[in-house]
Amino acid sequence: VEAEDLILCGGAVGSPQLLLLSGVGPADHLQDMGITLHHELPGVGQNLRDHPNVRIPVRVREDFPLDSEAPRTQLALRYTAAGSSDRNDMQILQSSFSSPMGGDPLEGEGIRFTCIIELAMGAGELKLTSTDPQVQPDLNYRYLEEPWDRERLREGVRLCLKLLEHPKYQDFVEDCISPTPKDLESDDDLDQWLLRNVTTTQHISGTCKMGPDSDPMAVVDQY
């Protein structure tokens, strides 16, 4: 390859994994793994960012057309959470077909909303589980550890349920599969539901953070 600038990147999982296996990263973690430290760089594998989301599946009437091969998501609602200083920090997706989590993707259970935090305060970390590069590292997302993330996601779920009360939805919606009325009795109950159901949007980033020399957690700079 001939070019002025070459960027070697293994993605948000592969890049920190490769650096750690090469002895570049947090000294204590490398010592725990029995890897010789060549360059201490504490930010490697830290600052794991994602867009935490929860799915709200909804049961529909039998005459509603559920087509597993049709475009499922063609509409998105971007909005700013109440009290947020970050514009459009939340997103709600509506899908015309929903399959059970972890089940057959072609098995229809109804429609669904997906409520997403676009700029979460919380961050996780990536750590090695083996010195074998073929072994998947451990991804600890630490979802919803920050109270502000839980507050915004609670608001998003309640907004989805409010949308379902609109007459246009009531024309074909039977009921909400999850969360249940019991899950909605209090903020604490809803928080427990969130923690049981929060998952990845598969938008991982940040594990080799870019920043200036003054940032001790920066891994690379703009050059």
Question: Which residue stretches match the model-derived regions?
Answer:
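FAD-dependent oxidoreductase catalytic-site/capping-region signature
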Residues: 61-65, 72-223
